């Protein structure tokens, strides 16, 4: 049996992971996509609410440290997460600059790409704050702090990291390279730092990057469309 030092969520078994993911994919996700998408906002976030309830149950059986919130090596984890996320966000600027410098901006694919504006209304601000802060936090605790660690207990780190990437990409019935890369990278960061902080920061950076593509760099929608 493989262990992960002080960070394995020992109370969460692979069997519990299978049951948790089965309920999510067979009940929660179909319900959200079929029945809940036109209902009040709490039901639109049924998946996040489900993740949150599972997190509360996991915390009842363990503690924050076992889910990855250890203060050991905190500065290193924050640096690695910030550096990884910073590289991702800065790469958007470089890619957009590349479109201009190579002349691709004159191609029909990159013309007439409208910039979306971020509304200053209170509801919009709350929505963006949720997308950038709350959702990454909940998803990382669930997918990395709980699911990845339970898989890591029974298999090698490499297989666990790849499995986490696949599971995350399937979480929304949307098998994409971007989703797989996010799940893979956050699990790898967790394995590297032994904490969840770097994974959360990187996920936040991805959420910020997605908003930047929609609002500041709309041409990258075409350039990076294969990822999503």
Language model region names:
Residues 1-10:
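Short, Lys/Arg-rich, polar N-terminal cytosolic tail immediately upstream
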Residues 9-17, 44-48, 73-81, 123-128, ...:
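Residue-level signature of transmembrane alpha-helical entry/exit and packing/kink sites
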Residues 11-63:
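Alpha-helical transmembrane segments in multi-pass membrane proteins
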Residues 24-44, 103, 212-228:
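Juxtamembrane/transmembrane-helix boundary motifs at the membrane-water interface
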Residues 37, 66-135, 220-228:
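Juxtamembrane helix-loop-helix connectors linking adjacent transmembrane helices
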Residues 37-46, 110-111, 184-188:
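Non-cytosolic membrane-interface motifs at loop->transmembrane helix junctions
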Residues 86, 121-228:
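Transmembrane helix-loop-helix hairpins at the membrane interface
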